[in-house]
Regions:
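Partner-binding and oligomerization surfaces adjacent to conserved cores of proteins
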Residues: 1-278
Length: 278
């Protein structure tokens, strides 16, 4: 079988979140503005801004193309929604940061059985809803140079944005939503990304509803301090092939098996973390 994705990618979470995911058969895709990576997304946008300005200053592009390039980038990198996974199913740093300090669960997912496409991500109007999956790119201090090289290749021989296909910009979008600082390489992270179409009145700033927007599909939760929007990403039970019980989680194996089967999940391998952590 020539799979596009790994068959085992792990989502670390608390035991209560694990129960919610299994019961509802969906992951939550969180607003990137409220994730741990929001600073990196802001830094990436600033780098793109600097690169476009440099290309304009160096007469590689003119003002019109600079504006078109910038707004095309902004449109496709408005707040996105992501869910994070790791190639590693028993990693101490992941247990500490995302698995309730070792008291949680790591859910193994076969990405090939999910309704996702590789590449992108792209934002679509109307009823087109596409979810994308890709491996995180761990960028070093030369990220700005990487962005510049990608943009130069995209615009080479082009006189306007009309000559540039959306797929040509895939490299920039990938870097934006799938890039992370080199210091996090140990996480071996993958992401599911969804770019909804959410519109706001330019004068009143009020959200616009309608059949061509995703407002009606937006869900909301609270973190105790603010209201946060998210989207649900549904999956079928056969997408889950294994769970790893955290090093500080004392759940009974038989009870976990009963819970999984009662919710339609069969043939799920149940493993216990091998990390000595208490």
């Amino acid at each position: 079988m020539n799979n596009k994705f790994p068959e085992k990618l792990y989502h670390y979470c608390s035991i209560s979140t694990f129960m919610s995911i299994i019961k509802n058969k969906c992951f939550w895709l969180s607003d990137t503005r409220y994730t741990n990576d929001k600073e990196e997304l802001a830094a990436f946008r600033a780098s793109v801004d600097e690169v476009i300005l440099e290309l304009l200053t160096d007469n590689v592009i003119d003002k019109k193309m600079a504006d078109e390039l910038w707004w095309t980038y902004i449109y496709n990198t408005l707040p996105g929604y992501i869910s994070c996974f790791s190639e590693k199913g028993d990693l101490l740093s992941q247990w500490r940061s995302y698995g309730d300090d070792g008291k949680g669960i790591a859910i193994s997912v076969d990405f090939n059985k999910l309704n996702i496409e590789k590449g992108g991500p792209f934002r679509f109007a109307g009823n087109v809803k596409k979810y994308y999956g890709n491996k995180v790119i761990y960028a070093d201090s030369n990220l700005k140079n990487q962005i510049k090289e990608i943009l130069k290749k995209i615009i080479e021989g082009k006189n306007s944005m009309a000559e540039i296909r959306p797929d040509d910009l895939c490299g920039i979008f990938n870097l934006s939503y799938y890039s992370k600082n080199e210091g996090f390489r140990e996480e071996a992270e993958w992401r599911i990304v969804y770019l909804p179409l959410l519109l706001f009145n330019s004068t009143t700033k009020e959200a616009i509803s309608g059949e061509n927007t995703d407002l009606e599909n937006t869900k909301f939760r609270t973190n105790g301090e603010k209201i946060i929007s998210y989207f649900e990403f549904s999956f079928l039970p056969d997408s889950i092939n294994e769970i790893v019980v955290g090093p500080k989680n004392n759940s009974d194996r038989d009870t976990l098996s009963m819970f999984l089967v009662a919710n339609g999940f069969r043939n799920v391998n149940i493993q216990k973390s091998q990390i000595p952590y208490s």
